[in-house]
Amino acid sequence: MRNYLLLRDRLTQVWLNKYSITVTILTAKIVLFNYFIIRILRYTEKYAISSCNGLDQVNRKVYDDLPIFVNTLGNYMIRKSMLESVEASLRGLEILIDASEGLLGFLVDLYLGTYACLLISAVDGAVDVATNTTEHILEAVNNTLIEATRGLDDGLNDLTSLINKGGNRLSSIFKSDNSVAASLSKVNFTVKGLRNIHLSSKINDQLQYMADKVPSFDDLKSETKDLISIPFYHVKREITKVNAESLLPDTKILYLRNNTDTTLYPICGQYIPNIKKVYEHLIHILKVGNILVAILGIFIALFMAIPSIQKEYQESKRLNNVQDEVSQYIDNKEFMSSGDNSSLNYSPFNDSKFNLAESYQRNFNPIARWMTIKMGKYFGNDETEYSERLQFCMLYIFSSRSSTIMAMGLIGLITVAIQLIVIQIISNYLSNTGKVHIQLQASNDEINKMIKSDINLWTSLANQYVNGTEANLNTQVFGWITNTTASVNATVAHAVDKIEYILASSFNNTPLYKPMKTVVGCAILRKLISVENAMTWINNEAHIKLPRINTTELINIAGHTKMLPSSNESHMFDQVEKIVNIARKTALNELYVPLALIGIWLTQIPMALLLSWRRCDTTGKT
């Protein structure tokens, strides 16, 4: 029995060769990687379905409860803001009415008090001057007339005596003529009347009466203020009795969506079968890929056993070749002498002319030998030293250890390449699954459209509510302002008429009427007319305009703030894409290992060159 393995013994272990084991490890790596992706996809599928169901619940709450809550809150805020606006308007009106009443009273005091006082003082002074002047004139005239009468009386007395004397004589002549006697008597009577003539003091009395009758306007001022205060009093009393709630329209006009209107949910649930289909298709691809990789790996591993069998035969043949070379060398030795027993102890391993290692490398490293022959032909250098150095470099680079590093690096590159191919297949499939995305996006657009429709309806009814509040406020509250200004205008008109009546009754047909009317018109009437114009302007402008809700701005705000949650479909595909990206990054990170191994193997090239040049002789052992 031999103490070493024969060829048939080694053939029983050919399936344990390094190539089959490497292929098996490579296959297991790819299969495990695919199963890792499958498990992640399973988890993501469960997460997506769970999130989809959760999204349906959220959308149901959002679409059912949130709009109702927002409607209720918005309606409450609108009603509250309208109520506060009405109450603030009422309080402001009270202040405005008090201020207006005080201002008008001040104007009455100013125009009918100050100016009238000055005017009356001026008139009183003028009448007093006229009365005093008249008294002096009357006194001077009367004194002059009295003195003249006295002088005339003395002269006439003498004339009368003379005439009477002559008359006695003439009477005897004209006894039958009574006209002469009458004329004489008349002359005496005329003188008598002249004696009694003087200017009457009634003129002075009339002037004094006129001075006492100059109007003081006190009654007019009091009457005007009383008339002005009447509408203000009634307005303030009505405002204090106003209930702000009564000015607001019925809240039933405001829109409140019924939760039974919902017809779109489940939004995402109806697409769960499509989501499952996407994941199942991906998982099916990976499972089929695993089966194919496993089958292919088994066949490759079995196929790798064939080269191992061939290698065993070749190694056996190479071993025989080495043995033949040794035998041939021994046969060629010239030591065949019958008397010499040294041939019995001869060993080629001790012969310096026979290099057993070179024979082994030449027969057991065919790759290095083949590379040496090809490179020698390529560079066209057949020198022995160059050929030996090249052969040494090839043997060093493709030694068993270096070849193992190189093989591991290449296998790693192949593994990473297969993983990247699988990842790219999944990525391509995801890029072709936009149909579900379009369907879900269409559903999302439909929901947004319905939300916008609800917003339009709500804002329309809310604006109707604001319109009703504004109309009630302008009619029931600011209508009093209209009535008040109309009453003030009527009072002012009455005051103007009364002033004109007083002037007419006091100064008509007198020299003072025209200047008095001019002065009063300038000092008082123009001011009252200005007040009347101001009241007319207030009457035309006294109304409130409440702001309306802008539908476009509200929809834009809702769009900018992402008020409606987006569909879960994009989130689902984002998760799958993240997994694919993570797997791609993992594969790319694994690429560093085979590249590092290839880099280590490449470092053997400069080391081989360095060692080949440092060899002292080309025939030495390596």
Curated annotation (Swiss-Prot):
One of its GO terms (biological process) is plasma membrane fusion involved in cytogamy. It is found in: Cell membrane. The chain crosses the membrane at residues 21-41, 103-123, 289-309, 405-425, 591-611. Glycans are attached at N132, N142, N188, N258, N467, N483, N489, N550, N568. Keywords: Cell membrane, Conjugation, Glycoprotein, Membrane, Transmembrane, Transmembrane helix. It comes from the Eukaryota. Residues 42-102, 310-404, 612-622 are cytoplasmic. The keyword Membrane applies. Residues 1-20, 124-288, 426-590 are extracellular. Belongs to the PRM1 family. PANTHER family: PLASMA MEMBRANE FUSION PROTEIN PRM1 (PTHR31030:SF1). Involved in cell fusion during mating by stabilizing the plasma membrane fusion event. This is Plasma membrane fusion protein PRM1.
